[in-house]
From Swiss-Prot:
This is Flap endonuclease Xni. Mg(2+) binds at residue 109. Its EC number is 3.1.-.-. Belongs to the Xni family. Binds 2 Mg(2+) per subunit. Only one magnesium ion has a direct interaction with the protein, the other interactions are indirect. It holds the Pfam family 5_3_exonuc. It comes from Aliivibrio fischeri (strain ATCC 700601 / ES114) (Vibrio fischeri). Signal peptide: none annotated.
Length: 259
């Protein structure tokens, strides 16, 4: 039987639903809305296997902050009411047949990437439900990303239109241009336009740095900040080697509600 694994970036979905609620303390409304959303996702995707991946609630920013100490240092904590209601949300999703994977210090992005990559490498279909463009670097013929809220696929044509690059160049792009929302600096003075120019001419940061054809206007910046670009690329990238502790059979989707 063909496999179709659906991975829900749980907090990505929940936070968007929560922020749209008139009463931010009304967790029952969040449960009701996310349950309705999940049912629509199930109908649209028809998964054989499904799991919701949750970030840990702690302020520990993980291995990325060890490389770039400023990484997400100003991120806002989860609203207290939402944090207290997380168990109830997970319970409601469990009744729909969806198990939760809770990270223990790892960012959800890396757990999603590890599971998605592992299954896609066996030529099985994987759909990630998320608005996070960072997952686009994982794209492959059997791995796709669905932005549920914008009703669009974050696929290779989307990456080409949005960035002008191939999915496999995105980590290099962010290594050069940075990601301001996560405090990933990139190379100072190299913004999106310059990063695109460089990566249109060269496939990687290393190739650009090693080439005598790198435009002079960028040579000094590379000489001064090359190592920073490499570190920023690493932080913007996704790990696919996290120990998950379960197998695919454990997350098989069985239609119907659990008691």
């Amino acid at each position: 039987m063909a496999i179709h694994l659906v991975i829900i970036d749980a907090l990505n979905l929940i936070r968007r639903v929560h922020s749209a609620q008139p009463n931010q303390d009304d967790i029952q409304a969040v449960i009701t809305t996310t349950t309705r959303t999940i049912n629509k996702i199930l109908k649209e995707t028809e998964p054989t296997h499904i799991i919701a991946v949750f970030d840990h609630h702690l302020q520990d920013r993980g291995w990325r902050a060890e490389i770039l100490p400023q990484y997400k240092e100003d991120r806002k904590p989860m609203p207290e009411a939402l944090q207290k209601g997380m168990d109830d949300i997970q319970e409601a999703w469990w009744k729909l047949g969806i198990d939760s994977l809770l990270s223990d210090g790892d960012e959800a992005d890396d757990l999603v990437a590890t599971l998605a990559n592992k299954v896609a490498m066996h030529n099985e279909q994987v759909t990630i439900i998320s608005t996070d463009k960072g997952y686009c670097q994982l794209l492959s013929p059997t791995l796709r990303i669905r932005d549920y809220f914008q009703h669009r696929w974050l696929d290779a044509p989307f990456v080409e239109k949005e960035f002008g690059l191939k999915p496999e160049q995105l980590a290099d792009y962010w290594g050069l241009a940075g990601i301001s929302s996560s405090k990933i600096t990139g190379i100072p003075g190299v913004g999106p336009k310059a990063a695109l120019e460089i990566l249109t001419q060269f496939p990687t940061i290393e190739a650009a740095n090693e080439s005598e054809d790198l435009p002079k206007k960028y040579r000094k910046k590379f000489d001064e900040h090359y190592e920073t670009a490499i570190l920023c690329r690493q932080v913007a990238g996704l790990r696919t080697d996290i120990e998950l502790g379960f197998n695919l059979q454990d997350i098989r989707y069985e239609k119907g509600t659990r008691d």
